Swiss-Prot record:
It comes from the Bacteria. GO terms for cellular component: ribonucleoprotein complex; ribosome. CDD domains: KOW_RPL26. This is Large ribosomal subunit protein uL24.
């Protein structure tokens, strides 16, 4: 998957189109990502010992990885992701500028 945890992304399709946020979690087997502040849903929580009140919680739901695009770290514009081998290691690069993407989990 070309999107990693900690990446800044922009939503390019769906009800939250145009919103930007940081990737909180990835689900590679399902091709889904959870983005901070995007696709917020209300979850009804039963009372438990940890949360005796229960109630309605707002949380982010996962969206498909094809609906988000990585933001270029320098220009802050959406860009595609490419791969390149540097010193025998596969690294992600920004297609627009050719710059290496630093993974900051």
């Amino acid at each position: 998957m070309h999107i990693k945890k900690g990446d800044n992304v922009k939503v390019i399709a769906g009800k939250d189109k145009g919103k930007e946020g940081k990737v909180i979690a990835t689900e590679p087997k399902k091709d889904r990502v959870v983005v901070e502040g995007v696709n917020v849903i209300k979850k009804h929580q039963k009372p438990t010992q940890l949360n005796p009140e229960g109630g309605i919680l707002e949380t982010e739901a996962a969206i498909h990885v094809s609906n988000v695009q990585l933001l270029d770290p320098k220009t802050n514009e959406p860009t595609r992701v490419g791969y390149k081998f540097v010193d025998g290691k596969k690294v992600r690069i920004v297609k627009k500028s050719g710059e290496e993407i630093k993974t900051n989990n």
